[in-house]
Each structure stands twice: as structure tokens, then as C-alpha cells.
Amino acid sequence: MTNMQLVPLLILVFVGPYFVKGKTLDRPLNEQVESNDLKRQITNIQNTVWTSKDISLLKRSIMKKNEEKLVVATAAKSESKMGSNYDYNDDDYDDYDDYEDYSNLVYEDDKEDEDFDYPY
């Protein structure tokens, strides 16, 4: 064997086991540890036995979050409707335009009361 044939054989002998196991030389050791921790966490979650109480608590918390979102969305929608129908910043708006002036009106009942002298 010549040296040119021996070099690829030596590379294959020393580097081959890393590729067979799925590990490469450029992959750092801490990534392998992190992936093993993640695999362990996933199997722990998969092996967890969920009781009916756990499931009902989870459902209740999800429903509560959805209700809060619904209330906020409804409030925002009603506020946007009110803002579109009524302009509070209108300069021409006068508080007293909507009310008629009743101060000068005299009712028939009031006239009768003026003529009557109360005993007290």
C-alpha cells in the first residue's frame, strides 16, 4: 500500500465511529448535554399521569384567560363605537344646546299656589 491509499483508511478508522453514532467532531459537548436534558424533560412530560383534577384546573385557567380577553375586546369595541358616534373634542359642541330653557315658564298650578295664602 502506498501512502496515498493509507491516509484515507486511517481517517476512516479514527473518524468513522463519530459518524456512526451520529456525533460529529464539530458539535460541542455542551450541545449534546443540552439535547439529552431536553429529551429527558420530554420523556418526563410524556410519562406524567394527568389526573382529572389537573385537567379541570387547566381547563378552568384557559377559560378564565379567554373570558378576560373577551371582556377586554368587548370594552374596546364598545369604546370605539362610542368614539365614532360622538365627538367629544368638537369645538362647536355646547352643553346647553340640547336643553330648552324652562325657567321663564309658569304653569297653571303655580299661579293658583301664588294666590293661596298658606297658614304657616
UniProtKB/Swiss-Prot annotation:
Cell compartments where the protein resides: Secreted
Signal sequence, renumbered to the chain: 1-22
Gene Ontology terms: cellular component: extracellular region
Tissue spec: Expressed by the venom gland.
Main location: secreted
One MF term in the entry's GO annotations: toxin activity
Superkingdom of this protein's organism: Eukaryota
Keywords: Secreted, Signal, Toxin
Protein family (similarity comment): Belongs to the scoloptoxin-25 family.
Name by which UniProt lists this protein: U-scoloptoxin(25)-Er1a
Organism, as annotated: Ethmostigmus rubripes (Giant centipede)
